Amino acid sequence: MTDSFPFSVQESVPLSRFSTFRIGGPARYFKELTSVSEALTVFSYLHTHPLPYIIIGKGSNCLFDDQGFDGLVLYNNIQGQEFLSDTQIKVLSGSSFALLGKRLSSQGFSGLEFAVGIPGTVGGAVFMNAGTTLANTASSLINVEIIDHSGILLSIPREKLLFSYRTSPFQKKPAFIASATFQLTKDPQAAKRAKALIEERILKQPYEYPSAGCIFRNPEGLSAGALIDRAGLKGLKIGGGQISEKHGNFIINTGNACTADILELIEIIQKTLKKQGISLHKEVRIIPFRL
């Protein structure tokens, strides 16, 4: 079947290798993207040859099914960056967001210090409008290049895109994010702030275990982690999955967790908080075996 594709694909690639949860069965088809031109070829093909597909980056916000994915998984590994001016930088979407924040802050640029603790790609950060209590991706974004559903490369200025808390227009109208351009400022204190952010995250979050980061979005004015803590759920374990004792909004893989373990913990948290009149909405992407 792979011979029918006009580009190279792999079969039966374990998705656990591409998930920070370390959970997931095999992808029926798997394609690594390493350039924008390659992505254009792939999406032009998909426009005329419908096939279920998903796009992944670092897999830091995904929970794959134990059966895997019955379709094509596109792994975005398109990396690179260039300064368009002294304080504007264009970054390809498969680049590490955390590494970008670290490098820029160490060079005296402010605007993306918060990225140092976000273990995903630039494309994933734009898609989720990733951020912290201090800032989010849209705060310094000035332009996004996308490949639309018909395989055409488009450049969209920030003012034409509507972002909100952990939400971008690309969640409702899927497109492949090819690059993002950010506006920076020069600030010699940027590295100090980035270092403090990393130290705080290491102290408060369970980096020693595989996880997908925060499972739930924070309700307005509230902390999901604090709510889960107050509900007495921290430390609850099902199979190999556990609600972190360090941070209530993290579910960790203690070694042999399966998808069902994580989903059951998510359901317990949601039902428990619902009884208190609080609705928690998932931040993590649950990717089923079949779309």
Swiss-Prot record:
Coiled coil: none annotated. It catalyses: UDP-N-acetyl-alpha-D-muramate + NADP(+) = UDP-N-acetyl-3-O-(1-carboxyvinyl)-alpha-D-glucosamine + NADPH + H(+). One of its GO terms (biological process) is regulation of cell shape. SUPFAM superfamilies: FAD-binding/transporter-associated domain-like, Uridine diphospho-N-Acetylenolpyruvylglucosamine reductase, MurB, C-terminal domain. The keyword Metal-binding does not apply. The active site is at R166, C214, E283. Its EC number is 1.3.1.98. Residues 22-187 form the FAD-binding PCMH-type domain. Its cofactor is FAD. Pathway: Cell wall biogenesis; peptidoglycan biosynthesis. GO terms for molecular function: FAD binding; UDP-N-acetylmuramate dehydrogenase activity. Keywords: Cell cycle, Cell division, Cell shape, Cell wall biogenesis/degradation, Cytoplasm, FAD, Flavoprotein, NADP, Oxidoreductase, Peptidoglycan synthesis. Gene3D superfamilies: 3.30.465.10, UDP-N-acetylenolpyruvoylglucosamine reductase, C-terminal domain, Uridine Diphospho-n-acetylenolpyruvylglucosamine Reductase, domain 2. InterPro entries: FAD-bd_PCMH, FAD-bd_PCMH-like_sf, FAD-bd_PCMH_sub1, FAD-bd_PCMH_sub2, MurB, MurB_C, MurB_C_sf, Oxid_FAD_bind_N. GO terms for cellular component: cytosol. It is an enzyme of class 1 (oxidoreductase). It is found in: Cytoplasm. PANTHER family: UDP-N-ACETYLENOLPYRUVOYLGLUCOSAMINE REDUCTASE. Belongs to the MurB family. Cell wall formation. This is UDP-N-acetylenolpyruvoylglucosamine reductase. It comes from Chlamydia trachomatis serovar A (strain ATCC VR-571B / DSM 19440 / HAR-13). The gene is murB.
